């Protein structure tokens, strides 16, 4: 069954005029929600993501609670890696830990290929369930970017400085490019499968790419990103790029064949546009503001909206994920304010 959905978010992704500014929040499904915390008392992340009914419920929860204009699939960026032979464990308080880190070209050559229908059927089943039976807003599929995935695979887990990753990139360029190309192939196949299952947009998260300078990005990372976006673009859905602490790379992202440039709070929207970013923009509230009094939040959000609304193609989001300490009522109030304030301003 084809469901009728609110396409305000998709229109903004395409740079079209909208009646109000659409909003959704990274990590909108998760630790800030009491309902989610109750589920986590019984089930692990692995168990939730491998259970389509449970995963769909968690994904839809913020749509019902906060009235956001898009849902994003609840899963981890590491989800596809076991399919290609990476031993990943999500450890509480640490994050992803990899038992077989990449150290050589031989390690890269041992990696396999992903077949989503066989390797991650539970993810595709969750998407189908959400898009055919549950959601009245678009579902965003996503993947980690090759650099961020490679950094986990080389470091063996989270890192503060990514020295091992960059040292590998500089010292072992043949192995580096083999790894990045292998991961690009995986990301392309993975995102296409999510779109075929029903995702109406996709976002690529390059969480740690801000550690790389512009010159190195152009040589070591950008060619693979160009290939990913060019290949996935043939699927006909909007594509979003997001990273953290990567304001120096926004023009490099803008050059890619994508639709939406994601910004964090370090770069004002008006400054990004002054630098030549004329594609749709998503962002860019510092999530720390969500812990402030409402009067402070409201004034800050007005400033962001006033910048974003100066041209069509603007989606409100955070510059990073929702903190566990954030009150869900604050997010609900925030969405209502974004919708009402922007509708009033855009009607003038």
UniProtKB/Swiss-Prot annotation:
Assigned EC number: 4.1.1.37
Compartment(s) of residence: Cytoplasm
GO BP of this protein: protoporphyrinogen IX biosynthetic process
Chain positions recorded as substrate binding sites: 27-31, 46, 76, 152, 207, 320
Main EC class the enzyme belongs to: lyase
Gene Ontology CC annotations of this record: cytosol
HAMAP family attached to this UniProt entry: URO_D
Family recorded in the similarity comment: Belongs to the uroporphyrinogen decarboxylase family.
Protein name per UniProt: Uroporphyrinogen decarboxylase
Encoding gene per record: hemE
């Amino acid at each position: 069954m084809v469901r009728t959905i609110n396409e305000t978010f998709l229109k903004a992704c395409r740079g079209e005029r909208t009646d109000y500014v659409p909003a959704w929040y990274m990590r909108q499904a998760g630790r800030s929600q009491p309902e989610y915390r109750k589920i986590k008392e019984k089930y692990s992340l692995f168990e939730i993501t491998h259970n389509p009914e449970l995963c769909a419920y968690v994904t839809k929860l913020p749509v019902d609670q906060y009235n956001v204009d898009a849902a994003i699939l609840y899963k981890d960026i590491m989800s596809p890696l076991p399919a290609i032979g990476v031993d990943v464990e999500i450890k509480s308080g640490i994050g992803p830990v990899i038992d077989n880190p990449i150290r050589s070209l031989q390690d890269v050559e041992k990696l396999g290929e992903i077949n989503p229908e066989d390797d991650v059927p539970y993810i595709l089943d969750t998407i189908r369930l959400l898009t055919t039976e549950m959601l009245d807003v678009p579902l965003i599929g996503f993947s980690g970017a090759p650099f961020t995935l490679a950094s986990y695979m080389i470091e063996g887990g989270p890192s503060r400085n990514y020295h091992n990753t960059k040292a590998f990139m500089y010292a072992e360029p043949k192995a580096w490019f083999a790894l990045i190309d292998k991961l690009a192939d995986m990301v392309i196949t993975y995102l296409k499968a999510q779109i075929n299952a029903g995702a109406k947009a996709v976002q690529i998260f390059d969480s740690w790419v801000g550690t790389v300078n512009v010159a190195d990005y152009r040589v070591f990372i950008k060619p693979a990103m160009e290939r990913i976006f060019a290949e996935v673009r043939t699927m006909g859905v909007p594509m979003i790029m997001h990273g953290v602490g990567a304001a120096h790379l926004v023009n490099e992202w803008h050059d890619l064949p994508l639709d939406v440039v994601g910004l964090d709070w370090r770069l004002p929207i008006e400054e990004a546009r002054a630098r030549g970013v004329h594609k749709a923009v998503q962002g860019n509230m510092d999530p720390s503001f969500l812990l402030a009094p409402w009067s402070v939040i409201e004034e800050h959000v007005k400033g962001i909206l006033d910048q974003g609304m100066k041209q069509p193609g603007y989606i409100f989001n955070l510059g990073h994920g929702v903190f566990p300490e954030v009150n869900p009522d604050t997010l609900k109030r925030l969405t209502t304010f974004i919708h009402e304030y922007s509708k009033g301003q855009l009607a003038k």
